[in-house]
A protein has these predicted regions:
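Metal-dependent nuclease catalytic cores that hydrolyze phosphodiester bonds in DNA/RNA
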Residues: 1-45, 172-174
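A structural signal for short, well-ordered beta-strand segments and their strand-loop junctions
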Residues: 20, 43, 47-51, 97-101
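Metal-dependent nuclease catalytic regions and adjoining charged, substrate-binding loops involved
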Residues: 76-78, 90-174
């Protein structure tokens, strides 16, 4: 059903326009050594769309040794990390941005009428992202690629990130 909902979203956003999926894009600041690379989920001549699926989660029935699949709620606002990702695709294409979330029951679509997908916000997010990446490149050069030296300059990872660091054991988290 999730796939059917994705088709509904694509029809709602793009109508009968021809689509390209998973196109690679690359960009960098003039001072950067390496390109930033990404893949646009869906793209037409006029718009881009980033898809985020919310699959059901496995839950245990209270007091029983039974499990069931529970629908994951759709967000009421775009996630800032997803808007940041979309900012890169927007920078590369300058096409109308869409961010959608879909589960097996429904979907929600955000477009540039939302503050987090506005042109100004996306450009600001792209600038923040590229400045961070440029700083990392310069730091790697300064440390001559020595990971031990580099680790002294790094801030600790965000262990509460929605999809990174899920499988760390307690020793790694410390």
């Amino acid at each position: 059903q999730t796939i059917q909902n994705i088709f509904k979203v694509l029809k709602e956003i793009f109508g009968n326009e021809k689509l390209v999926a998973e196109r690679y894009v690359a960009a960098k600041l003039k001072d950067m050594l390496h390109d930033i690379i990404g893949r646009i989920d869906y793209e037409s001549n006029n718009a881009i769309a980033e898809a985020k699926t919310k699959p059901p989660s496995l839950r245990k029935k209270k007091g029983k040794d039974e499990y069931y699949l529970a629908t994951t709620n759709l967000p009421t606002e775009p996630d800032h990390l997803h808007a940041s990702q979309l900012s890169f695709y927007y920078h590369c294409t300058k096409r109308k941005p869409f961010l959608f979330y879909v589960n097996e029951k429904d979907y929600v679509i955000f477009d540039d009428s939302h503050e987090l997908l506005s042109k100004d916000y996306l450009e600001e997010q792209y600038n923040i992202m590229t400045k961070k990446l440029l700083s990392w490149e310069q730091l790697i050069i300064f440390c001559k690629g020595d990971l031990n030296k580099l680790a002294h300059f790094a801030e600790p990872p965000e262990l509460n990130h929605p999809f990174y660091y899920r499988d760390l054991i307690q020793q790694q988290k410390q």
